[in-house]
């Protein structure tokens, strides 16, 4: 279950399950039939409450024909099957109590290098464990950096 924050011009996604390594929370993105090349994925935690950031992340890509996300079985792992999503040190350094500063000045984006340039249509992010109780993200980017 995912919810988008309301009542504010700043929206976020909140997933009410922490997941586990055996049963992670998964988000699948469809970049369209002819996506631009990319080599990085960027995540911004929900800056009002960075403790709801995921601890671990797995990134996979696919070009399979999608009718429903659970139908894709040929995912290609990109990088480690268990990479650090956000570390306690990173989050503590950005938890200054004035989250608006991070939007206007510092732009806390955690970038994940995918290695080579790629243009796969689907990206699946698998997340598990959290520094608090849920997973919250303000924004997710796909970019060629």
Task: Locate predicted features.
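Aromatic, loop-rich ligand-recognition surfaces of beta-strand-rich domains
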Residues: 3-74, 105-145
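Extracellular carbohydrate recognition and processing domains
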Residues: 72-114
């Amino acid at each position: 279950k995912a919810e988008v924050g309301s009542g504010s011009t700043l929206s976020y996604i909140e997933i009410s399950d922490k997941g586990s390594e055996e049963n992670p929370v998964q988000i699948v993105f469809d970049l369209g039939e002819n996506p631009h090349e990319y080599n990085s994925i960027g995540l911004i935690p929900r800056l009002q409450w960075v403790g709801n950031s995921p601890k671990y992340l797995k990134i996979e890509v696919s070009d399979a024909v999608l009718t429903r996300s659970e139908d894709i079985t040929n995912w290609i792992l990109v990088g480690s099957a268990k990479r650090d999503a956000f570390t306690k040190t990173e989050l503590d350094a950005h938890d200054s109590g004035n989250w608006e500063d991070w939007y206007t000045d510092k732009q806390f984006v955690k970038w994940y290098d995918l290695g080579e340039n790629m243009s796969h249509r689907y990206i699946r992010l698998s997340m598990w464990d959290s520094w608090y109780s849920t997973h919250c993200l303000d924004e997710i980017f796909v970019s060629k950096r």
